[in-house]
């Protein structure tokens, strides 16, 4: 992955102490100010990915975090197809897969009384069931994987820093002011106690700000531990439906045991009553909780840590104020159900950073940044609603088992056993349980939610057309289409020597047009339009005898335009515009689209 050096900074007063050819390291000047194009606050998934995307585009940036290092607990882990496509585009897919639990081991989600106890039911998850696996493989060049945040963050941070990001640990954001030229951010070096100012053209808040509304916060607790459980539960997630004895802190009858590393590092998640004081644990109590959960009294357990966190049901309706944009948990807070948190955070940054790059390179006016809120705020609402919906969908499982009102362990076990009876009531409970478990596909096999995102903004031109109606459940299934606003469909292209995806040749650093052999005039026009607008615009002509060929005919079946039509793909691989067939003046058509909508208010256009 290559990067471009960018020296487009205010030079007076700079005090450069080291320049490695990618990024110059400054000390505060005589006015105690350090300058950069973009300041990123926070090094989590949103922050570290934003730094990586910007540095890949050649945009100078500083990333600060008040902490000494990256995430110290596993936290997020499911990395869905859309995020893996983005990491593939950033050139780090192989690095991620080298550390991740691969897709084929993500396996089943098992519901059980305890991990070594009786199984209640299971569902194949994350596209591992054969029919759904085909859906996943046909939709994308990348498959989901399971990588803890403790391993993913350092990969993104390393690549960001190698490409030019200045990373400042133990540096705390204090406040900011902004004007029509930039943002002045007051920060604190927590090691020296020195306060200084970072002057940036734009500020990204990716520090996972907590909600101020106490009523929206619920308490949950994690215990991270090591134990060899390969004999009992070789699966990535095990909801434990029970009342393990001697556990004092519980949120009624639902626990989760999550695999961190196969099969000897795990994370226990359970709830406590937020009307009471938060629980205080020591290692001995934590070990006993783990043993009760697993159902093995003499299990050898090493406690790695425990931490509190909160559930929320919140999303922002506007993500930007002037030159300050927010991303990640700062704009959407929700339960971990469905694994949408870190995925959405990285996707926020992906959407924002190509727009920042266009503006900072002089290829677009600042109005383009307004489309960040227009496009991503509805996604924030969608994923918060879906995550909370997935969490609430556990109640029908308890209702089917008849244990919702159980108050003691004996009563719980007695009611749980009724599902096995040879009786009409037993049959009713079994049928209700199966229906409730099947409904969990909306959490664990919701490919449409994960990659079917649609953008409707001034950076998308539909020419008055309506989005095609879905023929299947839009949350469970992904429907491929080149309709503007949707994600570019995946198809395998190539030649006799190599094979690559449509996503691979529509790089995230430029706009791309796709056309066929009889659409060569579009490709010729693209060269002239790129020169007039001063942008990087790539033309791909697909067909027999061309450098790029439709190997299996998949692109022909998915493109939805004639061979002489054209599809404009934005740097984030969403369709910006399409024309069904050739027009009388392709250069004017392409110029008007790019200058008027996808890149609004270009300061100076070369006619």
Swiss-Prot record:
Gene Ontology BP, a term: phenol-containing compound catabolic process
Paired cysteines (S-S): none
Pfam family for this entry, one: Rng_hyd_C
The enzyme's E.C. designation: 1.14.13.7
Pathway(s) annotated for this protein in UniProt: Aromatic compound metabolism; phenol degradation
EC top class, as a word: oxidoreductase
Record GO terms (molecular function): FAD binding; phenol 2-monooxygenase activity
Catalysed reaction, written as an equation: phenol + NADPH + O2 + H(+) = catechol + NADP(+) + H2O
Ligand binding (FAD): 37-66, 319-329
UniProtKB keywords: Aromatic hydrocarbons catabolism, FAD, Flavoprotein, Monooxygenase, NADP, Oxidoreductase, Plasmid
Co-factor(s): FAD
Coiled-coil regions, chain positions: none
InterPro entries, per database record: FAD-bd, FAD/NAD-bd_sf, RIFMO-like
Record flagged with keyword Oxidoreductase: yes
Region (Disordered): 1-28
Family membership: Belongs to the PheA/TfdB FAD monooxygenase family.
Protein name as annotated: Phenol 2-monooxygenase
Organism: Pseudomonas sp. (strain EST1001)
């Amino acid at each position: 992955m290559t990067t471009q050096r960018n020296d487009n900074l205010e030079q007076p007063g700079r005090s450069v102490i080291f320049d490695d050819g990618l990024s110059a390291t400054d000390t505060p000047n005589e006015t105690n100010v350090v300058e950069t194009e973009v300041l990123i606050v926070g090094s989590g998934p949103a922050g570290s990915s934003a730094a990586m995307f910007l540095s890949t585009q050649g945009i100078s940036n500083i990333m600060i975090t008040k902490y000494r290092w990256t995430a110290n607990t596993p936290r997020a882990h499911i990395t869905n197809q859309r995020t893996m496509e983005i990491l593939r585009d950033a050139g780090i897919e192989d690095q991620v897969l080298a550390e991740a639990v691969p897709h084929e081991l993500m396996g089943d989600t098992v519901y059980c009384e305890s991990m070594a106890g009786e199984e209640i039911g299971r569902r194949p998850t994350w596209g591992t069931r054969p029919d759904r696996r085909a859906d996943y493989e046909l939709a994308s060049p990348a498959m989901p994987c399971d990588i803890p945040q403790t391993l993913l963050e350092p990969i993104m941070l390393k690549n960001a820093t190698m490409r030019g990001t200045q990373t400042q640990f133990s540096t705390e954001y204090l406040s900011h002011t902004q004007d029509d030229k930039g943002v002045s951010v007051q920060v604190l070096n927590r090691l020296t106690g020195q306060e200084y100012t970072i002057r940036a053209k734009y500020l990204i808040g990716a520090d996972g700000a907590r909600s101020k509304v106490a009523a929206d916060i619920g308490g949950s607790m994690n215990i991270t531990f090591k134990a060899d459980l390969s004999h009992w539960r070789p699966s990535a997630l095990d909801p434990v439906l029970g009342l393990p004895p001697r556990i004092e802190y519980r949120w009624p009858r639902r626990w989760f045991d999550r695999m961190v590393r196969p099969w000897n590092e795990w994370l226990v998640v359970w709830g406590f009553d937020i009307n009471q004081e938060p629980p205080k644990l020591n290692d001995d109590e934590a070990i006993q909780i783990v043993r009760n959960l697993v159902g093995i009294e003499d299990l050898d357990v090493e406690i790695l840590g425990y931490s509190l966190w909160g559930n929320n049901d919140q999303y922002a309706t506007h993500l930007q104020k002037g030159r300050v944009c927010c991303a990640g948990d700062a704009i959407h807070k929700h339960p971990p159900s469905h694994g949408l948190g870190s995925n959405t955070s990285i996707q926020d940054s992906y959407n924002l950073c190509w727009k920042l790059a266009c503006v900072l390179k002089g290829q677009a006016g600042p109005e383009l940044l307004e489309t960040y809120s227009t496009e991503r705020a509805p996604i924030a609402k969608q994923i918060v609603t879906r995550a909370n919906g997935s969490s609430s969908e556990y109640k029908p499982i308890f209702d089917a088992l008849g244990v919702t009102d159980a108050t003691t362990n004996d009563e719980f076990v007695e009611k749980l056993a009724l599902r096995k009876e040879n009786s009409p009531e037993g049959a009713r409970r079994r049928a209700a349980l199966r229906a409730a478990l099947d409904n969990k596909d909306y959490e664990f096999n919701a490919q449409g939610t994960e990659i079917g995102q649609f953008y409707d903004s001034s950076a998308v031109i539909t020419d008055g057309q309506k989005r095609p109606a879905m023929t299947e459940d839009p949350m469970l299934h992904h429907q491929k289409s080149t309709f503007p606003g949707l994600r570019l469909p995946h198809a395998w292209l190539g030649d006799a020597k190599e094979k690559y995806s449509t996503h691979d040749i529509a790089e995230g650093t430029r706009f791309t047009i796709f056309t066929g052999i009889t659409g060569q005039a579009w490709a010729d026009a693209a060269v002239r339009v790129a020169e007039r607008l001063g942008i990087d615009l790539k033309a791909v002509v697909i067909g027999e005898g061309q450098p790029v060929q439709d190997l299996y005919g998949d692109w022909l079946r998915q493109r939805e335009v004639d061979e002489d039509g054209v599809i404009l793909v934005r740097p984030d691989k969403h369709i910006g515009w399409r024309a069904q067939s050739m027009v009388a003046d392709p250069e004017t058509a392409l110029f008007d689209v790019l200058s008027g909508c996808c890149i609004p208010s270009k300061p100076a256009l070369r006619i």
